Amino acid sequence: FLDSALLGLEYALLAVGVYITFRILNLPDLTVDGSFTFGMAVSTVLCAAAHPFAGLLAGALAGAAAGVVTGFLQTHCKIHPILAGILTMSGLYTVNITVLGGPNVSLLDAPKFFEVLGGKAPAVGLVTAVIVVLVTLFFQTVGGLCIRAAGSNEDMVRASSINTTAVRWAALALANALVALSGAILAQCQGFGDVGAGSGMIIIGLASVIIGEVICGRRGIVIGIV
């Protein structure tokens, strides 16, 4: 049971990222499988170089970059959101192999972030809780409200002289940063990074969102993210 709970915590930020795109922004984003592995690959390389905390941060930034690429394809290249996500995900497969330098990399002898924070469960729980609180607070700010409004009625937001392109980019960057951070955490907790680890992550994320809504219902942004 404890192992299952820990695995759930490791995937928690993945679910939050999927929730942001599919429920708040109302946009299908299939970049998830690629950005999850991208975050894992970057985290693995830096962790192997004895920089575990930098690996988490860089992994999240890598995911944000992947989200921006998807946003660019949608807004500037006028590609359908589903196809844009597939294109980014496919391109990231080659990038991930290049970053890792092979199909997988072991981290058995490398220092991990949770070793400094008192073990896997406390460390992952702390990081997840802090990120969830920060994301929840962000969606109460002007920027967060713009994303929520764009998901409800993009035409109205555009008529209010708000840059909907920037809003979409920001939402996709945030969502994929969280997804990639989940991959970065998982890599260090399981002790290796694998180029095929992202396969099926979008299904896991969507299933988490749907199960959460069945249990808690749609009771607003705070309950939704939690």
Predicted segments, located by residue:
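Hydrophobic positions within alpha-helical transmembrane segments of bacterial inner-membrane proteins
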Residues: 16, 56, 60, 64, ...
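Transmembrane helix-bundle core of multi-pass membrane transporters
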Residues: 81, 85-140, 169-170, 190-195
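Alpha-helical transmembrane segments within multi-pass membrane transporters and channels
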Residues: 51-90
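Hydrophobic core segments of alpha-helical transmembrane domains in multi-pass membrane transport
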Residues: 15, 40, 44, 93-94, ...
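Single transmembrane alpha-helix segments in multi-pass membrane proteins
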Residues: 1-51, 73-77, 210-219
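Hydrophobic alpha-helical transmembrane segments
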Residues: 4, 9, 34, 53-61, ...
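Membrane-helix/interface signature in polytopic inner-membrane proteins
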Residues: 133-173
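Transmembrane alpha-helical segments in multi-pass inner-membrane proteins
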Residues: 179, 190-226
